């Protein structure tokens, strides 16, 4: 309990002699008063309930008079409990240190004149460090044995003044009277703290000697506290020399940021609380690093700091055109955003998803968009990510906790409105640590991401100003709720003509510059580039073309570096010398019309491609064998196709008895590549009919479409990619579902002029366009027992 300060004291006060005890200011102390001292108590009650308590140092053996200490404590009587037989119990409260001036009387009780000793308070860094060290030593002592009562620990933890802490511990600790009196007479609080610290250290060493097993651990704790004390003293000396304490410099810098107008109010309140906590933590403590990192993130986050958008639509159009060829739909969407943003400043960032095969420019397009808007660009790859904490962060209770990648990158960018690209969103994993795709639902939802709460920050951050762009090769593996939050923009593959334009406009100048050929003029003939495209690459994008052009440039650079004659123009006949034998052939479609082999079209992560469906029959018991690493959906498509052919055998001139004595083997090369999807249904059915009727399939016809049990052909995706793949493979006629008519608008006019694209609605139309009538090749019967052979149909 803290006593009330005294402005003045009476000239004479009764003195209570205390043997073998010392009373300190701010402490409550019970005393039992005998009858012989009741007059002293009555006198004190008349003098504002005040009396002086002096410790008796000795008694004169001749006179019997008590010799008082020169420094004592003026106390206030808070409570008097009188006993029936005489005497009483009083509760004294220490108020202030006093110095004995003179003793005025001795009998019947001592009266003296005293003077108040002003209480000094020392709040410098050394005193604060000593207080923290003493508290830590008390915890060490408590682990070795109960040095203080439990309630005393709680009381001491609440003391924030160095002098009071030293006085309180002097009462609770088992100190000798002479040591307590010396502390009472020590007026400098810092010196009193040092004495208490030394006493605690000595006591702990004694307890360690008795404690045994835990001695090493406790000794290390004491040593750490000593080191901490020395460091704090060093800081105090540095301050006196004008050298600033780095810890205090950080605190001041953080506080200036917290008190600025940039932080939202809810974040400021959390930051101020953490900053106050940081000030109380010992900088050498591991907890200090954790707290400082958290405060640093709070101060460095761009809560209301962003870049100014460049709202010049013509300039943005020029920037996008300079970086990327074609991609009209994507560019138009960005310009629409700019136009709306120029009319309405408080516009939420769009959530776009670029879907297309590798190498078509999805990632580089995001960087170009950021440049056209004048925004910071951030990119993280989600491929293989399996830990939800990568998105939401770790809670600070974990060792090594950090924010999620979203908050980390925004903090690093220093702007709250960057263009943020989440690459490979279709390749996110999932395991026991959570589902990152589910964590992205809040990030990519404009109705929720204005208050995105990272587990580490634990305060909301507004993501609504961020323009999120995700990329994917296919959308099949993206969860439907996540897909629903994104505006999907498809980037189809490029035709050979488009690749040629991209090579001359972007790839060749880039590789010439990167390979140090700026001073050596190097040009490519158009036929040379076309030869590279057709003979050395087979992809929907332009990544392989870029690598082949880079290989040519490196060989020229090598010749220049060696002082040899280096070509200035790359001609068509030089390509094979530099890149070796051709790797791909344009006429990869079947070289001849074959029975049971039909060309289909597939859509993969790498763009469009052609596939061959091969069917073979043999005597057996109606077994259907499927090989070629076919997925469940494709296997079901094969069974559906066979069921349709059996149900409508008469329409195709097939005897029903054929199916009772045959095994059918269906294979789709290459066997090591997994294949799946429903769009091969019409191709499988056509191959079955070709084999069972012995009618060859035209080698220059390719098809795609999902077949139903009723013979209808359902629409499919990736029309442009599949048509381009057919064109690369030398196919001249492509059969597409009638319901994909609108998708033909994606194809350039010159492609439609070069190829024949037929729209079909049922399997009969497909058979008519694909299988060669028997009149062209003569009768063909499949190899089976003669009694099973059927007459070839007259036509289809």
From Swiss-Prot:
Domain Lon proteolytic, chain residue ranges per copy: 592-773
Residues the entry annotates as binding ATP: 356-363
Pfam family, one: Lon_C
Catalytic activity as recorded in UniProt: Hydrolysis of proteins in presence of ATP
Active site per UniProt: 679, 722
EC numbers on record: 3.4.21.53
One of the protein's GO biological processes: protein quality control for misfolded or incompletely synthesized proteins
Record InterPro entries: AAA+_ATPase, ATPase_AAA_core, Lon_bac, Lon_bac/euk-typ, Lon_lid, Lon_proteolytic, Lon_Prtase, Lon_prtase_N
SMART domains referenced in this protein's UniProt entry, alphabetically: AAA, LON
Cell compartment(s), UniProt: Cytoplasm
GO annotations of cellular component type: cytoplasm
Record keywords, A-Z: ATP-binding, Cytoplasm, Hydrolase, Nucleotide-binding, Protease, Serine protease, Stress response
Keyword Hydrolase on entry: yes
Domain of life: Bacteria
Description of what induces expression: By heat shock.
Domain Lon N-terminal intervals: 13-204
PANTHER family: ATP DEPENDENT LON PROTEASE FAMILY MEMBER
Protein's job: ATP-dependent serine protease that mediates the selective degradation of mutant and abnormal proteins as well as certain short-lived regulatory proteins. Required for cellular homeostasis and for survival from DNA damage and developmental changes induced by stress. Degrades polypeptides processively to yield small peptide fragments that are 5 to 10 amino acids long. Binds to DNA in a double-stranded, site-specific manner.
Subunit structure: Homohexamer. Organized in a ring with a central cavity.
Annotated protein name in UniProt: Lon protease 2
Protein species of origin: Syntrophotalea carbinolica (strain DSM 2380 / NBRC 103641 / GraBd1) (Pelobacter carbinolicus)
